[in-house]
């Protein structure tokens, strides 16, 4: 008898072949990187935490003289990253590590740059900063994209949704304060554009719905995943003026 896939297995199967597991773009990654001032001649050590299938990891490898440790909990995503890195001749710059982001085996002051796009929410913005700061050299940089309110008041539906999904959702000014209170000096910030959400994330997702449902024989769990994603897309289209991903770039000063 064929074993039924769990919800998390279905979610991985739905997202593993996508270029991205969240909003973003090559241009967003490079824009965030432009706020740093690394010596191009010095080989850097970089950690990309919660990397997924690694679209941004590839961008970093193509634009930095660096050894990049790409961390994710799910081997299916890391396998995709390894294949892409090899196809692009970047396999010598990227090391993949299957590990939880709250249990990392890194040394104190090991990295020049810690990167995480759309993933720090898993352990929370403040907790993530406090944990990961130890792995960063003084003068090193942290770059994070994080769900952020873009106004000080919101319609009840989207306010209630995000406070339930992620209680640490807040405005950029509050996130900057958290960075400053934890030994960082913010050097750059911007919101992700609508195309980073729609063109690069939601539209490709919509294109996969039918194939995913057919593959999994329209089971209740598979349909539930698609329905939840459709509702997320609806909320973004309806309330995009009130929230986005903010990209925060900060330098460790103490």
What residue ranges belong to the model's regions?
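Class I SAM-dependent methyltransferase SAM/SAH-binding core
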Residues: 47, 53-103
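A short SAM/SAH-binding and catalytic strip from SAM-dependent methyltransferases
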Residues: 113-126
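A short glycine-rich, Lys/Arg-flanked "PGG" loop and its adjoining helix->strand segment in the class I
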Residues: 127-141
């Amino acid at each position: 008898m064929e074993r039924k896939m769990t919800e998390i297995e279905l979610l991985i199967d739905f997202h593993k072949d996508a270029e991205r597991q969240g909003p973003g773009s090559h241009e967003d990654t490079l824009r965030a990187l432009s706020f740093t001032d690394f010596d191009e001649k010095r080989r850097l050590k970089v950690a990309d935490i919660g990397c997924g299938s690694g679209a941004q990891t590839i961008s970093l490898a193509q634009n930095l003289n660096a050894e990049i440790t790409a961390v994710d909990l799910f081997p299916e995503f890391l396998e995709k990253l390894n294949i892409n890195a090899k196809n692009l001749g970047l396999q010598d710059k990227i090391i993949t590590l299957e590990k939880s982001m709250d249990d990392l085996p890194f040394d104190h002051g090991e990295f020049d740059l810690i990167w995480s796009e759309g993933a720090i929410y898993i352990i929370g913005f403040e907790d993530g900063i406090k944990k990961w700061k130890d792995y960063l050299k003084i003068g090193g940089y942290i770059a994070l994209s994080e769900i952020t309110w873009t106004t000080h008041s919101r319609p009840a539906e989207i306010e209630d949704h995000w406070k339930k999904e992620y209680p640490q959702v807040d405005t950029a000014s509050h996130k900057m304060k958290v960075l400053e209170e934890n030994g960082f000096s913010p050097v750059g910030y911007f919101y992700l554009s609508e195309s980073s959400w729609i063109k690069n994330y939601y539209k490709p997702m919509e294109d996969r719905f039918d194939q995913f449902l057919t593959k999994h024989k329209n089971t209740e769990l598979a349909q539930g995943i698609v329905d939840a994603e459709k509702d997320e897309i609806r909320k973004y289209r309806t309330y995009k003026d009130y929230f986005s991903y903010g990209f925060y770039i900060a330098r460790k000063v103490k």
